[in-house]
UniProtKB/Swiss-Prot annotation:
The chain crosses the membrane at residues 5-25, 31-51, 60-80, 86-106. Belongs to the UPF0060 family. It comes from the Bacteria. This is UPF0060 membrane protein DSY4629.
Amino acid sequence: MFYAIILFILAGLAEIGGGYLVWLWLREAKPFWYGIIGGLILVLYGVIPTLQKFPSFGRVYAAYGGVFVILAVLWGWGIDKKVPDNYDWIGAVICLVGVSVMLWAPRN
């Protein structure tokens, strides 16, 4: 379980970090190399989920989506300095509950 959580966090940081660098390049006129580095990090994001031990692509990506929501809220708060409101936190917790059900529910 710890390994799965670490991989979800790494994938989220790669997706958000890479996307953020591309955003800075295209939306905030940062140098071209921001976009190149962002693109390379996004390629890494595409590889990380394949290291998960869960057998189903759909389940891994659906569960990762919930983790992504949490990380995006935290990124916005820490990097963009946009303080999440109560609804952001409630929605993020709901996503984590859903992820937990999807990944660790007892199945036959």
